[in-house]
Amino acid sequence: MVKPTKSNIGVYTNPAHDLWVAEAEPSLEQVQTGEKLAPGEVTVAVKSTGICGSDVHFWHAGCIGPMIVEDDHILGHESAGVVVAVHENVKSLKVGDRVAIEPNIICGECEPCLTGRYNGCDSVLFRSTPPVPGLLRRYVNHPAMWCHKIGDMSYENGSLLEPLSVALAGVQRAEVRLGDPILVCGAGPIGLVTLACVKAAGAEPIIITDIDEGRLAFAKEFCPSVRTHKVDFKHTPEDFAKAITELGGGVEPAIALECTGVESSIAGAIQTVKFGGKVFVIGVGKNEIKIPFMRLSTREVDLQFQYRYANTWPRAIRLLQGGVINLEKLVTHRFKIEDALEAFKTAADPKTGAIKVQIQSFEEGESR
């Protein structure tokens, strides 16, 4: 392992929607001595971090619902790196271990924590969600229990474990079964990872929708057997349902995995699934939306949601390590941490064709 030699810098935003790179904690000296580590913590030299849509949203909008950027704030929560220091009471990890960082810190005492649904922790601290500083920096101290060993997996793949966990949580809770006809709404990063998950789960046929022809073409390249549909805003939910059913060979989807959070897309999914079907919303949308209540009621359609994930990371690691799912094509752009502003501009601009933009920080000669 190459020892840390570079100063710690992080990627910040603020209420004025600025984005910049500046010094961050812990300092290089603190990393080298381990003096800032609390019991149970390790220092991770972060090597690859994916830019999530929520990072761009915090930069541009300054908030997501009640989560508001009120001060200088470090972004990023999709990270992997190498352990460079451990507190003396940590036995599960050692210096040199390659890890992916599950970006939450929980209380371990509330009902959700005690019943295994820690994503609902009353006191959760989630990296990059204000006011908790994120992982987009060279070094970060984090509880060892939330640093998952990834063996010889690349850091790029390690940082894809976070969006994979989001999709995996949705597919598990939606109870996708072998041979289920599935509709995936949205061909952004989460939609594409969800597509990979339902394909691995044996769903057939699979249809994916989007408003962007470029993203649909990427989805077809990523998963050749998928059927694609370009959304037309002029169409009613009924028109959408008819088109999807025809594309599926007359078979209505059993489950729609909605990855956009857009009101019209959710309404279209509700209109489309079969009697007794399910619409599972993975995407994040507005505080309030209108839904076709009577369609849900008279067709016995279940409408479900998720909030982040719980207990998915070990499973996600096995899926990537075993080659059951391959997400490498999703990383379309890579930038050094010093070039974070350009990275964020690329991630935010639909014209770039970016799917997953990663920010990376490597020492000279270091394994990736």
Curated annotation (Swiss-Prot):
Gene Ontology MF terms in the entry: L-iditol 2-dehydrogenase (NAD+) activity; metal ion binding; nucleotide binding
Reaction(s) catalysed (UniProt annotation): L-arabinitol + NAD(+) = L-xylulose + NADH + H(+)
Phenotype of null mutants: Affects the ability to produce liamocins with an arabinol headgroup.
Keywords noted in UniProt: Metal-binding, NAD, Nucleotide-binding, Oxidoreductase, Zinc
Residues the record lists as binding Zn(2+) 1: C52, H77, E78, E162
Inducing factors: Expression is regulated by the cAMP-PKA and HOG1 signaling pathways via the transcriptional activator MSN2.
Family note: Belongs to the zinc-containing alcohol dehydrogenase family.
Function: Plays a key role in liamocins biosynthesis by providing the arabinol moity that is linked to 3,5-dihydroxydecanoic acid (provided by the HR-PKS PKS1) via ester bond formation catalyzed by the esterase EST1.
Protein name: L-arabinitol 4-dehydrogenase
